[in-house]
A protein has these predicted regions:
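Glycine-rich Rossmann NAD(P)(H)-binding loop
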Residues: 4-10
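Catalytic P-loop NTPase motifs of RecA-like helicase/translocase cores
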Residues: 10-11, 90
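A structural motif corresponding to the C-terminal lobe/cap of the Radical SAM core domain
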Residues: 19-238, 295-298, 302-307
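Generic enzyme active-site microenvironment
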Residues: 3-4, 83
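Membrane-proximal basic amphipathic "stem/tether" segments
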Residues: 12-29, 225-307
Length: 307
């Protein structure tokens, strides 16, 4: 099950420390109450059957808070999406995350999640203005050494409402290419079968070069040998097989269909994804729980869950 929260870790230790330094009592009490609510939620999740598994999204700062990570493990929150975005100081500045770690410090921080029983789906962006050909290999190396369970490597795409989109649209002006009567600056209005892949322009690399190098990183990370090594975090052979199939499915769904521009390759990837999804569904089917009780808050009574 996915805990639908764009940041499951709402109060960082740094936030608490800042409120204390500022002697902001009201803010400190507010943060502590919010933090306590999240711990209470995890205590209640921990009362559910052990085959109920949860996933969520979290910020890198959570690695500093091992008490929170341990509570996640007890709550059976097996994994979290973490937006790493970039592995170089220049790349982090491009995405306004200059406060994040790079190099060995980044590897250590990401490993902290795994060491406390929380698998990480790391998200990386390629095509940032500061990216160079060496960035791709450096990113693949970090993803390998950081002990990530899964990773996604996306190409920088200008989406409406973002600073990148506004700059891209302004740079094209009235010269934007058109598909039919629709400019590519409104690419979401173009029929799916005619819609081009739209990526932010790069100062030194072409879209084709970025696409090819991005695909190579996907191929590297999701090679069968590397997937099998990563699957050792699972407790049983059934779980290892499920991990391998899920990894291959993830790659087919997001790399081959999301990056490829050749329609034949996309169709091939879709067929493979459907084939892999069938055994995945069987392996991930849980036993029925007709008498499942919703965990009670402290001092309360449990409530029977509705089917």
């Amino acid at each position: 099950m996915a805990l639908a929260d764009d940041n499951f870790y709402p109060v960082a230790l740094a936030d608490l420390a800042m409120a204390e330094r500022q002697h902001n009592v009201a803010r400190l009490e507010q943060l502590r109450a919010l933090r306590a609510e999240r711990f209470e939620l995890m205590e209640r999740l921990a009362q559910l059957p052990p085959d109920m598994v949860f996933f969520t999204q979290i910020t890198m700062e959570a690695a500093e808070d091992v008490a929170f990570l341990d509570a996640m493990r007890r709550a059976n929150i097996k994994g979290a999406l973490v937006g790493v975005e970039a592995v170089t100081p220049e790349g982090l500045k491009d995405v306004y995350k200059g406060f994040n770690d790079v190099g060995e410090a980044l590897v250590t921080r990401l490993r902290t999640f795994r060491d406390h029983g929380v698998g990480v789906l790391g998200s990386f962006i390629f095509g940032l203005p500061s990216d160079r050909s060496s960035t791709f290999a450096a990113t693949a190396d970090i993803a390998d050494r950081a002990g990530l369970a899964f990773a996604q490597f996306v190409m920088l795409t200008p989406y409406p409402g973002t600073v990148d989109f506004a700059a891209w649209e302004k740079s094209l002006g009235n010269n934007a290419a058109r598909i039919g009567d629709i400019p590519v600056t409104r690419h979401w209005l173009i029929p799916q079968e005619k819609r081009p892949k739209v990526y932010a322009p790069h100062p030194v690399m072409s879209p084709d070069e970025i696409r090819a190098r991005t695909q190579a990183v996907w191929d590297h990370f999701y090679s069968l040998r590397r997937i099998w090594v990563r699957s050792r975090v699972t407790p049983t052979i059934r779980a290892r097989i499920a991990f391998v199939l899920l990894s291959k499915l993830y790659r087919q769904m997001y790399a081959n269909t999301g990056i490829a521009t050749d329609s034949a390759r996309v169709n091939r990837a879709n067929r493979w994804a459907r084939l892999i999804a069938r055994p995945c569904r069987y392996l991930f089917t849980a036993r029925p729980l007709p008498d499942l009780q919703l965990p009670a808050a402290e001092g309360g009574a449990g409530v029977r869950a509705r089917a």
